[in-house]
């Protein structure tokens, strides 16, 4: 039976099991066991301190990274246990604030709320010898994407080869954005996590602007529970990843390097058109360009740099575009992200209808390709791992 048929069968079985689970949970569990009262429009406990307001492919030449500075350890457990976030009253009466769109007013009014309690945690993922942590941003409703990733590129390895340790996978989630659906989806997620034990979840709403929260929460979690992991791959739940190529790329890399590799955008300008998803008002960011940043659903970094990023990000005000925010954090450290042709932000070809975007020989050579639907990912994974004969060998290592 082919992989996609097996996955379809498993998904059907899991769906039936979830329906049964919901019935059981609804009879035996109160909603409060999984969620606190609904959060304010946007997130968490206030962060104190002085914050800065920021107004051949694979083996190609690489920068020699400076030695990683010593970073003091933070708390040894997740130390945020309550949600106590109130609106920033000082902003609400400012004329410039009132002129903004509602979602920007909400973001700014609660931007000081940085960290939230954990609902699901798996520190055991970093027990033993772990070489690379694969971390996937997801949302509570996208079970099908998580299931396909577990069956394909997110499958865990006990050894990365060449004497290296294990490869472990985690999914990062907030809570359901619609209050009326929250209890239902939380019960389903609890059941999913009992099956797979691979979900990190925090008590903030999953939304586009809260993706930045997901970044800083993971960096804090990594610093607490996984401080010695050599490398981290972080991606979205709609990308194709070739883990074999990732590991080959890392084969001559050192964990002490300030490594941050992806599809890097340089001299990107803030978008000022209000109908664009990535629109940013000038009052929120007045500079002509963003710092260099890696976009497009996936990047690779050393664990030592991730720890530095955690502390660097804590010196900045939150920014609503997560990729750009990480670029700002890198700028604080004086680290420039490295561009790599094996990371494809907009598909292998920017022309969506191009045959190249459906050519498995290209996917076999890449590290990360964005973006694919679950069925497309399954089909491409099967093709790439079949007895595929390519007329031209693409050298990307």
Swiss-Prot record:
The chain crosses the membrane at residues 7-26. One of its GO terms (molecular function) is acetylglucosaminyltransferase activity. Pathway: Protein modification; protein glycosylation. One of its GO terms (biological process) is keratan sulfate proteoglycan biosynthetic process. Disruption phenotype: Mutant mice are born at the expected Mendelian rate and have normal developmental and reproductive potential. They develop an abnormal corneal ultrastructure characterized by a lack of keratan sulfate proteoglycans that appears to be compensated by increased amount of elongated, branched electron dense chondroitin sulfate/dermatan sulfate proteoglycan filaments. Belongs to the glycosyltransferase 31 family. N-acetyl glucosamine (GlcNAc) transferase that catalyzes the transfer of GlcNAc via a beta1->3 linkage from UDP-GlcNAc to the non-reducing terminal galactose (Gal) in the linearly growing chain of N- and O-linked keratan sulfate proteoglycans. Cooperates with B4GALT4 galactosyltransferase and CHST6 and CHST1 sulfotransferases to construct and elongate mono- and disulfated disaccharide units [->3Galbeta1->4(6-sulfoGlcNAcbeta)1->] and [->3(6-sulfoGalbeta)1->4(6-sulfoGlcNAcbeta)1->] within keratan sulfate polymer. This is UDP-GlcNAc:betaGal beta-1,3-N-acetylglucosaminyltransferase 7. It comes from Mus musculus. The lineage of its organism: Eukaryota, Metazoa, Chordata, Craniata, Vertebrata.
């Amino acid at each position: 039976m082919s992989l996609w048929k097996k996955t379809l069968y498993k998904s059907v079985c899991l769906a039936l099991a979830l329906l049964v689970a919901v019935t059981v949970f609804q009879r035996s569990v109160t909603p409060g066991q999984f969620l606190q009262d609904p959060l304010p429009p946007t997130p968490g406990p206030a962060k104190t301190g002085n914050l800065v307001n920021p107004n051949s492919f694979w083996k190609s030449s690489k920068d020699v990274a400076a030695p990683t500075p010593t970073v003091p350890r933070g708390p040894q457990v997740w130390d945020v246990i309550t949600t106590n976030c109130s609106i920033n009253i000082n902003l609400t009466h400012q004329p410039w604030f009132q002129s903004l769109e509602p979602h920007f007013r909400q973001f700014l009014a609660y931007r000081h709320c940085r960290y939230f309690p954990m609902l699901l945690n798996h520190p055991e993922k970093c027990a033993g010898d772990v070489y690379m942590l694969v971390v996937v941003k997801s949302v509570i409703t996208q079970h099908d994407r998580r299931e396909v990733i577990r069956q394909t590129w997110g499958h865990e390895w006990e050894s990365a080869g060449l004497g290296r340790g294990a490869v472990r996978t985690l999914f990062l989630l907030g809570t359901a954005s619609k209050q009326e659906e929250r209890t239902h989806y939380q019960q389903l997620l609890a059941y999913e996590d009992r099956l797979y034990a691979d979900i990190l979840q925090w008590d903030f709403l999953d939304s586009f602007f809260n993706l930045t929260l997901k970044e800083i929460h993971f960096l804090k979690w990594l610093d607490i529970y996984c401080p010695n992991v050599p490398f981290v791959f972080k991606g979205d739940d709609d990308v194709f990843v070739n883990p074999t190529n990732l590991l080959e790329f890392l084969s001559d890399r050192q964990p002490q390097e300030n490594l941050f590799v992806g599809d890097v955008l340089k001299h990107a300008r803030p978008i000022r058109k209000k109908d664009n998803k990535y629109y940013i008002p000038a009052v929120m960011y007045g500079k002509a360009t963003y710092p260099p940043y890696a976009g497009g659903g996936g990047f690779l970094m050393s664990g030592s740099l991730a720890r530095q990023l955690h502390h660097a990000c804590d010196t900045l005000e939150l920014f609503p575009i997560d990729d750009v925010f990480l670029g700002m954090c890198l700028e604080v450290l004086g680290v420039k992200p490295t561009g790599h042709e094996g990371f494809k932000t907009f598909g292998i070809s920017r022309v969506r209808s191009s045959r190249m975007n459906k050519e498995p020989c290209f996917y076999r050579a890449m590290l990360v390709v964005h973006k694919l639907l679950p069925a497309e990912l399954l089909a491409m994974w099967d093709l790439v791992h079949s007895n595929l004969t390519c007329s031209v060998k693409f050298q990307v290592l």
